[in-house]
Regions:
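N-terminal Sec-pathway targeting helices
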Residues: 2-23
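Surface-exposed, glycine-biased beta-strand/turn segments
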Residues: 27-123, 155, 168, 205-206
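Acidic, glycine-rich catalytic/binding loops that coordinate metals and/or anionic ligands
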Residues: 60, 148-149, 154, 161, ...
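Small beta-barrel nucleic-acid-binding modules, principally OB-folds
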Residues: 84-97, 126-133, 185-195
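Short, charged helix-to-loop "capping" segments that act as catalytic/coupling loops
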Residues: 94-106, 141-150, 164-178, 186-192
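Zn2+-dependent peptidoglycan hydrolase active-site motif and core
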Residues: 106-148, 173, 177-178
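A generic structural motif
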Residues: 119, 141, 165, 197-201
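Short hydrophobic beta/alpha edge segments that flank linear recognition/processing sites
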Residues: 124-127, 154-170
Length: 206
């Protein structure tokens, strides 16, 4: 009788011990995961700060000359819904909606790494700054002379005129108001990611 009682006690104690051990393992595992998450969040925050500093350092000039600044409007439309995905830039609109009227200049020093027609972007130029960040100018009506892949450009250099090209085969225009679509992209490993240009445009204008 007493032996069975002791056996039952031993079994209960063993089960309790296993439960406590399992709880301890779960708590340690959760703490490790939380620690990793906090560390990862800290790394991401640091990377964002570094990217912000890089872009601020890259941008020297507003992409529209000062003489035409009062003749454009823009707002933060980054992330707005589009037919294909979301808007990955900021649109600077010509208040007179006239094709080829307002010149577009490079906001950074850099090298032309893309030029030509895109179905959605129309006539566009992509300029990669020395930092590696990519600056994208789309819907141009035409290019400045000598613009080609490999050309070195300086901030403030004329690269083309604002237009309404795109959303069709080469030469398509007029499907939307005349504007410059200005985009900023950076490499995150093998992925190219967009950045909201709006706050940087505001900062350039300060």
């Amino acid at each position: 009788m007493h032996t069975h009682y002791k056996d039952r006690n031993s079994t209960v104690i063993g089960v309790i011990f296993l439960i406590l051990l399992l709880q301890a393992v779960i708590i340690v595992s959760l703490n490790v995961k939380i620690g990793r998450s906090v560390h990862h969040a800290g790394e991401v925050k640091q990377q964002e700060k570094q990217l912000n500093r890089t872009i601020i350092s890259d941008l020297h000039t507003f992409p529209v000359p000062a003489a035409f600044r009062s003749e454009i409007t823009y707002e933060d439309s980054y992330g707005a819904g589009r037919i294909q995905g979301s808007h990955e830039g900021c649109d600077l609109l010509d208040t007179q909606n006239t094709e080829g009227r307002i010149p577009v200049v490079s906001a950074t020093d850099g090298e032309v790494t893309n030029i030509g027609w895109l179905y959605l972007g129309g006539y566009r130029i992509g300029i990669t700054a020395p930092s590696g960040v990519y600056y994208y100018y789309a819907h141009l009506s035409s290019y400045a002379g000598g613009m080609e892949v490999g050309k070195k450009v300086q901030a403030g250099e004329w690269i083309g005129f604002m237009g309404s090209t795109g959303e069709g085969e080469e030469g398509t225009k007029g499907k939307f108001p005349v504007h410059l679509h200005f985009g900023i992209y950076y490499q995150d490993g093998t992925d190219e990611k967009a950045v909201d240009p709006y706050p940087y445009l505001l900062k350039i204008e300060e």
